[in-house]
């Protein structure tokens, strides 16, 4: 047998074996219809991933990882651009996560390595106020700095960051990194902590150390998430309620439009000014502390005080707050069709009244809504790029992604990224 024929035969055998393995997986997944079997698959995938990452850790730090600390990225089911208006939000933690493989070393050095990034970032625990300019590692340094200011002893450790939350997607990769770091450092310091405190420390690190203006929702969901539940959260008081997010034969598909984020913060600040202007006008006739306290009926009676974009912005906030409560009731009643309708309404409002979508998010959402397998779709996050979420029938996800992805590419000129998600716990700690 000639060498070229041998190579072709080996390649053919490899391809056929790979097809057989893929077929076995597809068959197994098709018959895997209950939660117990799904949990077995998830456990096996996690164990395999941990084994690979432990090998990576050892190749970098020449020692074995002891623990993996994780925190979730997040979606906000509904309730966009209302948190700074006193409204309630409805986030949930995802299976897209920041996983920190760690080993306590003692001393005063924290060494960090990152998936997809060459080299090691090293910070000293007695110089934590000097790393604000770091391009990589400043979130971690900020968390360590504020924990130390609270009296937590920050001990030396080696950390490998494996983050599956897409960066720049609006799924809060920064919050997941911060919260996972916070639980890591608290565990290694041997101190008791509660998850709300982890969220608050993480938010403070992002605001005051990294210099990024954000509310508490992202870190709260990342820390406090609960499997198969969303969190109805009042960002002003931190009062919260877990609401079962049972989608049955449906799942949430996240689509990233992959548009570069430009000038998001400046547009965000303009929107805040506009709703504050609306509130001041409404307060001349109604004794309310925030726009979220205004009911749709009251708004109809006082909207004459507003005009132009200020009126549109206020209308979105008032109606979106009402939609949050309606969505909670729909979930409690098991009415997924109504939930989907509310997601669609939310997107229309963000597009027409708050004007934070853009052609990319509008295209993704519109193409999703054309699919019979989709109950509803809307943008999530600050807007002007980022992601949509869609409620899609599980058995139709592959076709949904293929058709929506093609339509989006044909319309926009570049590809979207899709993620079939599950709702998971926020913070987890696992000994390896």
Where are these regions (language model features)?
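C-terminal nucleotide
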Residues: 49-74, 99-133, 229-376, 391-432
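Short Gly/aromatic-enriched secondary-structure transition segments
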Residues: 86-93, 271-272
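Intrinsic-disorder-associated, low-complexity terminal segments enriched in Asp/Asn/His/Tyr and depleted
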Residues: 12, 17, 30-34, 50
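Gly/Ser-rich oxyanion-binding loop with an adjacent helix/lid
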Residues: 53-68, 75-79, 84, 88, ...
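Short, positively charged and aromatic/hydrophobic N-terminal segments
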Residues: 26-34, 40-41
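Cationic, amphipathic, low-complexity segments that mediate targeting or membrane/lipid association
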Residues: 21-25
């Amino acid at each position: 047998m000639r060498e070229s024929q041998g190579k072709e035969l080996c390649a053919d055998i490899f391809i056929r074996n790979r097809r057989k393995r893929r077929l076995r997986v597809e068959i197994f997944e098709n018959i895997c219809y209950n939660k117990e079997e799904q949990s077995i698959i998830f456990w096996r995938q996690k164990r395999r991933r941990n084994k690979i990452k432990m090998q990576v850790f050892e190749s970098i730090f020449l020692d074995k990882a002891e623990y993996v600390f994780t925190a979730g990225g997040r979606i906000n089911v509904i309730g966009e651009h209302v948190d700074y208006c006193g409204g309630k939000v409805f986030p949930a933690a995802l299976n897209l996560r920041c996983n920190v493989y760690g080993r306590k070393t003692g001393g005063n050095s924290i060494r960090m390595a990152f998936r997809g990034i060459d080299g090691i970032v090293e910070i000293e625990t007695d110089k934590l106020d000097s790393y604000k300019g770091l391009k990589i590692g400043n979130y971690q340094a900020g968390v360590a700095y504020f924990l130390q200011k609270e009296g937590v002893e920050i001990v030396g450790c080696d950390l490998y960051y494996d983050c599956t939350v897409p960066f720049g997607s609006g799924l809060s990769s920064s919050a997941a990194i911060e919260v996972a770091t916070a639980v890591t450092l608290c565990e290694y310091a041997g101190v008791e902590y509660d998850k709300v405190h982890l969220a608050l420390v993480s938010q403070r690190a992002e605001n005051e150390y990294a210099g990024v203006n954000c509310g508490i929702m992202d870190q709260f969901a990342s820390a406090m998430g609960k499997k198969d539940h969303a969190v109805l959260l009042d960002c002003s008081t931190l009062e919260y309620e877990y609401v079962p997010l049972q989608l049955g034969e449906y799942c949430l598909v996240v689509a990233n439009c992959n548009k570069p984020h430009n000038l998001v913060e400046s547009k965000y600040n303009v929107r805040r000014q506009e709703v504050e202007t609306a509130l001041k006008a409404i307060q001349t006739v109604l004794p309310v502390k925030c726009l979220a306290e205004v009911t749709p009926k009251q708004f109809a009676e006082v909207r004459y005080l507003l005009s132009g974009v200020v009126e549109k912005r206020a209308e979105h906030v008032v109606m979106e707050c009402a939609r949050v409560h309606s969505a909670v009731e729909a979930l409690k009643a098991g009415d997924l069709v109504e939930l989907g309708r509310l997601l669609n309404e939310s997107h229309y409002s963000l597009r027409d009244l708050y004007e934070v979508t853009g052609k990319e998010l509008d295209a993704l959402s519109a193409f999703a809504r054309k699919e019979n397998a989709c109950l509803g779709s809307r943008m999530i996050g600050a807007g002007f790029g980022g992601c949509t979420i869609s409620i899609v029938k599980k058995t139709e996800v592959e076709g949904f992604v293929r058709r929506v992805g093609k339509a989006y590419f044909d319309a926009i000129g570049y590809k979207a990224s899709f993620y079939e998600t599950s709702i998971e716990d926020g913070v987890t700690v696992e000994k390896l």
